[in-house]
Amino acid sequence: MAVSWCDYICWWYSDYFLKRFKLRNNMKKHILGLLFLSVAGTCLTSCGDDFFDTKNYTGVDVDNGLTDASSVRNAVNGEYDWFYHYYFAGDFATMIGDIPTDLSYWNGSSAHMDAIYSYTMTDEESYLLYIWNYGYKVIDNSARAINAGKKLYETSTEEDKKTLDVALAEAYALRAYAKLALVNIYGHQIKVNGQDFSDQPGIVISEEPIKAFEQVSRSTVGETYTSIVADLKDAIEHFGKAGADRGKKVYFTKAAAEGLLARVYLYMENWSDAASYAQQALDDADVSAIATTADEYKAMYSSTGVNTESLFYLSIDDKHNWAANSCGTLWSTYSFSPSPKLQKMYGANDCRTSIFIWDASSTPTKPIFKGGKFPTVTTTNYLINAPEMYLIKAEAKLHGTTAADFDEARNSLLVVAKRNADITSVEQLGTTKDEVLAFLKDERARELFQEGLRLYDLRRWDEKASVYAYGAPEVKFTFNNYKISDFVYPIPVDEIN
């Protein structure tokens, strides 16, 4: 009997985890439908020298030394150190959303993220362990700063309250970002084309710092999203109380928190709030137009901080970068490039292809890219950006019920689609909801490539995906018509009892 790849991988992982957890044979039939075994209420243990470690930042012990507004602010500054590490937002936790999708191509010359790309990873995969560890460093240390800030708040001076408000806002936003990244990677999408998966296993959430060797369990996906929304609303509230943010986009701002909340609501299929917060983010960031020429577009990726469309980016530059572990290296020396499929999706006059530059040694059959949005190892990650807000608003309004919603959807989509100079009117985007939605899905691929969102788009749309491209320059995939909405990465085995 012929066995499909999807059936085989389902069987292999089910059998593997049954042995790993020593489950009874009569339970096997209940988990064959999942790509990876996810156990609701799985017991996990925090390790003393692992992801629940605290950190001394500028000499301040975050367990005992957060005794004033300045120390809380400094502790939050320390959160960005964990957050921007290449183990997390600086590379692995971001790029894992693009590498295993139809947008990426691996030429086979190096062994970086190759198991992720080829779907041969196990629960012992180091990338998955690093993402988990550093995500929880952000979450746990954020909890410490939040708890300390809340205790100090009522007895603080008005000036110190403003300092605490900004610190608390950033801590809540960082924690929300980390939770969303982890639940996207280790949990099911909360909604898949209208179907609710809120009751599926999510991640470990706790409002309190988790002690070393404390036994904890997973919340549901729905509970995880509820906590993410609460954190982001708290962040926005504290930015409002402060009357301002730091005004530097290497720190979370009010606009960035609103933009992230718009993304969360999009995943939840809460169309009204997704559109509302996307527009609020654009308004607060004072963005009303985006680049439409090759020169304008290339300039945004020439150095850190010059991208006027970004709401939040990492403090990666000539002095602070990850060198060989950077995204620039991943998308060049480490063999990854835009897939032949993606390249064919761009029009001849699309300004976004102005950054598609190839190495002198590149050939059609063995492409060697020169970074794209990461042309050097010193180029930063732009994590929350204005074009995504226009696309969120377009998709949300497309699910509206009125002619005005449809018009607003096309107008928002047109802002981004005009990166292709040949597109000048909404009529070119489609005249029916289905046509416009199909265009929007492709536009998200074109616009958000290298921003780490493709995997979650394919899953939430319930696309029959093609993955593991090969045979460049032809459009070929090892696995086709794959129900990727059921794909969930395993929690690292080191974290499971």
Language-model features: where?
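Bacterial Sec-dependent N-terminal signal peptides
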Residues: 15-31, 37, 41-70, 228, ...
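Acidic, glycine-rich segments characteristic of secretory precursors and extracytoplasmic regions
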Residues: 47-97, 299, 487-497
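Hydrophobic-face positions in mid-chain alpha helices that act as interaction patches
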Residues: 74, 104, 251, 269, ...
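Conserved, well-structured interaction surfaces
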Residues: 112-186, 219, 237-240, 244, ...
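Short coil/linker segments at helix-helix boundaries
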Residues: 155, 159-162, 185-226, 230
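TPR-repeat structural position
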Residues: 225, 271, 403-406
